[in-house]
Amino acid sequence: LYVKYILRLLHLLRPLFPQVVVNYGYHLPKAILASWIYGNPGRDLEIIGVTGTDGKTTTSTMIYHILKTAGKKVALISTVDAKVGRKNIKTGFHVTSPNPFALQALLRRMRSQKIRYVVLEVTSHGLDQFRIYPIKPKIAVLTNITHEHLDYHHTFKAYQTAKLKLFKS
């Protein structure tokens, strides 16, 4: 109950601080809390992270279908939807990675269904804001990097640095 109020207070204070402070002071603790609440289900799954400016959804979907066709127990979390077992779950993410609570809930559901592989589409915003923390992908895929999202990242170097976080985890 108190967690809800603390998160609400932090959300209200966000505009007062630079993005890097928000990322480490708000997003990272939120990701740690979500992982703790859901029992860090990602540690029991083989995560394949896919990032890039363009082609993330297509590449993630192709990897998902390759593994599924090979008979592997696989799930997919993309900006379009999540595929868990025989279900397509509308996520409402559409253009970005899920918030840590939604992601951890999906991963716990996948773990409970004995899924082994999860193909996870990851955006630069999601990486910068620790949305997938503490997940450590076994495989990381980069489709490409072009001059996009500079409204958020401000410089191309900062954008590249955000994308590379997937490979450092």
Regions found by a protein language model. Give the residues of each.
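Long, basic/Gly/Ser/Thr-rich N-terminal segments
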Residues: 1-4
